[in-house]
Swiss-Prot record:
Its cofactor is Zn(2+). It comes from Thermosynechococcus vestitus (strain NIES-2133 / IAM M-273 / BP-1). One of its GO terms (biological process) is negative regulation of DNA-templated transcription. The lineage of its organism: Bacteria, Bacillati, Cyanobacteriota, Cyanophyceae, Acaryochloridales. The gene is nrdR. Belongs to the NrdR family. This is Transcriptional repressor NrdR. Residues 49-139 form the ATP-cone domain. A zinc finger (unnamed) spans 3-34. Binds 1 zinc ion.
C-alpha cells in the first residue's frame, strides 16, 4: 500500500478490524519509510448497477448521490448520520442481491421513500417533494393525506426482481 504522505510502497499493518457492518475491513498502517500512520479500507467490489433515468438515459449507480439526497431530506430532523448511512447501505445491499444489473430511478426512489417513512415522516415528505416533483401545496396536501390514510408497512419490501 502506497503511503499518502511520502508515496513509499512499503507499510506494515498495525491493526485490522471489521467496519461498515462487516462490509469492509479497516486497517491502520505505518509507513516503513517516513513512519507516519494512515488508515485504509478494504471492500468487496460489487458488480456495477446501472440506473435508468426518467428520460431513458443510463448512468452508474452513485451511492454518494443517493446519500446526499437523503441527507438533504433529513436536514434539521436530528436523525443520526449513522442511521442515514445505514438506510443507504440497506438500499445498496438490496440492489446487489438482485439478479438484474439495471434499476429504474423510480424503483430507487420508492425504495428510499419506503425506508424514510420508517425513519421520519418529515424526511419522507421532503424527499417525496423532490422525487415526485411536487408543483404546489396541493401535492403536499395529497401526500400528507396518503400518509395518514395508509399505515407504513411493518416490513420493508425489496427492490423488484423482474
Amino acid at each position: 500500500m502506497q503511503c499518502p504522505y511520502c508515496h513509499h510502497t512499503d507499510s506494515r499493518v498495525l491493526e485490522s478490524r471489521s467496519a461498515e457492518g462487516g462490509q469492509s475491513i479497516r486497517r491502520r498502517r505505518e509507513c516503513l519509510a517516513c513512519g507516519r500512520r494512515f488508515t485504509t479500507y478494504e471492500r468487496i467490489e460489487f458488480v456495477p448497477i446501472t440506473v435508468i433515468k426518467r428520460n431513458g438515459d443510463r448512468e452508474s449507480f452513485d451511492r454518494s448521490k443517493l446519500l446526499r439526497g437523503i441527507m438533504t431530506a433529513c436536514g434539521k430532523t436530528n436523525i443520526p448520520q449513522q442511521k442515514i448511512e445505514a438506510l443507504v447501505d440497506d438500499i445498496e445491499a438490496d440492489l446487489q442481491l438482485r439478479s438484474r444489473r439495471e434499476v429504474t430511478s423510480a424503483e430507487l426512489g420508492e425504495a428510499a421513500l419506503q425506508r424514510l417513512r420508517h425513519l421520519s415522516e418529515v424526511a419522507y415528505v421532503r424527499f417525496a417533494s423532490v422525487y415526485r416533483q411536487f408543483q404546489g401545496i396541493s401535492d403536499f396536501v395529497a401526500e400528507l393525506a396518503h400518509l395518514q390514510e395508509t399505515p407504513a408497512s411493518p416490513e420493508l419490501l425489496t427492490i423488484s426482481q423482474s
